[in-house]
Amino acid sequence: RERAGCAKGWIPFDGRCYGFFPQELSWRRAEGFCQRLGARTHLASIHSEEEHQAIVSMLASSQPYSDSEEEAGEEVWIGLHRPLGRRNWEWSDGTKLDYGSWYRDVFLRRRACVALEDTTDFATWDVELCSDRKPFICEYRT
């Protein structure tokens, strides 16, 4: 059965649905995976403290984070990235960057993709190598 218009296993928040995927992919492959799930599905974009909290709560209740200490310790991809040759961050779904919760927002040439930082219980964002393989969150609008 669908929850608030979301597919089974997805979490609803404010007209969007979020799904956590534990398989580890590069940022680009994760975005491609999300897009293949359906029209208008992308890596998650975050536009408010409330939306961020909803995602953090979902991660807290997702495997493998809740079961064993040594499993915890991975950042989780979201849809923020800096396209090649650009200086500005962009969401993969094309929405505007109007909220931030940076652990560090630094211009590191080789680090152009953003993940939720596990050491702060996913409360902050950090810049990572896009080729790093991490679990990820997909999102679609209902």
UniProtKB/Swiss-Prot annotation:
Protein species of origin: Struthio camelus
Gene Ontology CC annotation, any one: extracellular region
One Pfam family from the record: Lectin_C
Disulphide bond pairs: C6-C17, C34-C138, C113-C130
MF terms in GO: carbohydrate binding
Limits of the C-type lectin domain: 13-139
Coiled-coil regions, chain positions: none
Positions of modified residues (Phosphoserine): S62, S66, S68
Entry keyword set: Disulfide bond, Extracellular matrix, Lectin, Phosphoprotein, Secreted
Keyword Nuclease: no
Location of this chain's protein in the cell: Secreted, Extracellular space, Extracellular matrix
Protease found in the keyword field: no
Signal peptide: none
Main location: secreted
Protein name in the entry: Struthiocalcin-2
InterPro entries (alphabetical): C-type_lectin-like, C-type_lectin-like/link_sf, C-type_lectin/snaclec_domain, CTDL_fold
